[in-house]
Amino acid sequence: MGKRLRAQRRGTGGSQYRSPSHRHVDDIRLPAFDEGAGTIKDLIQAPGRTSPLAVIDFNGETDYQLAVAGTKVGQQVTVGGSKVAAGNITSLYNIPEGTSIHNIEAKPGDGGKFVKTAGSSATIVSRGEKVIILMPSGANKEFNPNCRAVIGVVAGGGRGDKPLAKAGKNYLTLRSRATANKWVKGVAMNAVDHPHGGGSHPHVGGPNCQSRTASPGQKAGFIAPKKKKRK
């Protein structure tokens, strides 16, 4: 019997495939309270995240939020209200059209789900019964006006400008997210290791398209591909 595929091993959720959450600083969620003010005490780098984090003191209670481009240590940020300034957290109906925002809630009170990558932001397009937001993908998405978001652009937008240059740096970067930096292709394996392996030739040697309902061990190659459009 052949060995399990990489996707099958990953699906069991072993420690080598799970994100090392014990090294993560905190679960980044918008504050649970509706109104308040805090002060940025520090800006730190967090393993497993592409952007730095801001350490914010809310009346003696420490909270971690995604750092916003242009903010600095000692700056005051507010929760609630209608003041439009980088780093402030407020409901979507308070934010005027054309404003850049990030860490948007999918449902009121869920803590923020959308637009959390370094350098990313979304834009308010219109407000009414639903707030329409232009997402980084280019799609327009509707949100409940009571959903909250952070005003500004996520910091760390230039992280891709400097090349990694060394395989070791790439390895350490991806390890913080439990992602491998090297992948062996199936045709280079032995037949016992992969359906595409064996045969002493660098090609699959047969059909490499699989049905959507195929068993997990068969799912190697193209899964339920669509037909190529004819011009």
Predicted regions and their residues:
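Basic, glycine/proline-rich low-complexity segments that contact nucleic acids
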Residues: 1-51, 73-231
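Beta-strand/loop nucleic-acid-binding surfaces
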Residues: 61-72
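Short, conserved beta-strand segments within well-ordered enzyme catalytic domains
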Residues: 53-57, 64, 78
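Conserved strand-loop elements at the edges of beta-sheets that form or border functional pockets
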Residues: 58, 67, 126
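Glycine-centered tight beta-turn/hairpin loop motif at sheet-sheet or coil-to-beta transitions
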Residues: 58-61, 136-138
